[in-house]
């Protein structure tokens, strides 16, 4: 057994002045719950998440100060945001506090965006893997509502794969016009995994890698960026659905 397994997960970093803090022991307690099944953490707007620093900075445009102020008032009225131990801090409570804690622990994010979705479907899914083999999953709908939950990583990946475009994998064709395939596709998706670092409460994007899926006439085209020219898309050589799933999982390693 490793030291981490004996001693529990590493504590969340201490909050910066003006940050929202989360109760001690919260992370380890929730980890035990996730091992028994998904832990659903509620739905929030981007302004509410930004107000408590619960969103990766480079993924979203920052709402206006007026919108953020209204979000703070809304959270305070619901007792999700209360005074902290000093005048410079506030404490995030309830499920939103859990979201903050696990967002801060992540150091990479999978961002999947899909076209051709149906009413009631999310158009975007974020996965923020954790060291213990679980992840924070955020489903974003057309209204910008963020449905958040904690899941085992393998289960979250299965959910993601079921949501992404499917079909019989097309044979790689070097002469294929990628732009034409994407334009004519019934459903397409861009999956980007970005590593990042934290500087205080701010996240700074690092290296990233992409996988592009496009379903056209029942065939699934699997593309990636050409390493010689990242503006160009080329077939990946994926042979079947299992190969696609392995490539998606490989983006996170």
What is the predicted function of each stretch?
Residues 2-76, 82-86:
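Short, amphipathic alpha-helical interface elements at domain boundaries
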Residues 16-23, 146-153, 237, 241:
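Intrinsic-disorder-associated interaction segments
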Residues 64-92, 155-180:
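Charged, compositionally biased non-catalytic regions
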Residues 71, 102-117, 205-222:
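Amphipathic protein-protein interaction modules
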Residues 82-134, 139-154:
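Accessory beta->alpha helical hairpin/"wing" motif in late/C-terminal subdomains of nucleic-acid enzymes
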Residues 135-137, 191-195, 220-223:
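Short polybasic amphipathic segments
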Residues 146-201, 206:
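Internal, well-folded beta-alpha domain core
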Residues 199-253:
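Extended, charged low-complexity segments
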């Amino acid at each position: 057994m490793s030291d981490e397994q004996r001693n529990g997960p590493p504590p969340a970093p201490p909050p910066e002045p003006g940050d929202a803090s989360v109760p001690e022991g919260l992370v380890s307690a929730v980890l035990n719950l996730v091992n028994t099944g998904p832990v659903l953490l509620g739905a929030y707007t981007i302004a509410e998440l930004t107000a408590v620093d619960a969103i990766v900075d480079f993924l979203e445009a920052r709402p206006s100060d007026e919108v953020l102020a209204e979000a703070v008032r809304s959270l305070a009225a619901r007792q999700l945001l209360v005074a902290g131990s000093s005048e410079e801090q506030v404490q995030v409570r309830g499920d939103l506090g859990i979201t903050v804690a696990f967002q801060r622990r992540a150091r990479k994010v999978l961002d999947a965006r899909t076209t051709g979705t149906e009413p009631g479907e999310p158009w975007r899914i974020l996965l923020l893997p954790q060291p213990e083999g679980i992840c924070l999953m955020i489903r974003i709908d057309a209204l910008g509502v963020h449905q958040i939950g904690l899941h085992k990583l393998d289960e979250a990946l299965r959910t993601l794969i079921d949501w992404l475009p499917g079909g019989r994998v097309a044979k790689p064709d070097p002469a294929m016009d990628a732009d034409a395939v994407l334009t004519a596709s019934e459903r397409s998706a861009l999956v980007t995994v970005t590593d990042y670092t934290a500087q205080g409460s701010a996240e700074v994007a690092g290296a990233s890698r992409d996988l592009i899926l496009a379903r056209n006439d029942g065939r699934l085209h699997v593309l990636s960026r050409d390493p010689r020219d990242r503006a160009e898309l080329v077939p990946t050589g994926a042979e079947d659905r299992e190969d696609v799933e392995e490539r998606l999982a490989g983006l996170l390693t």
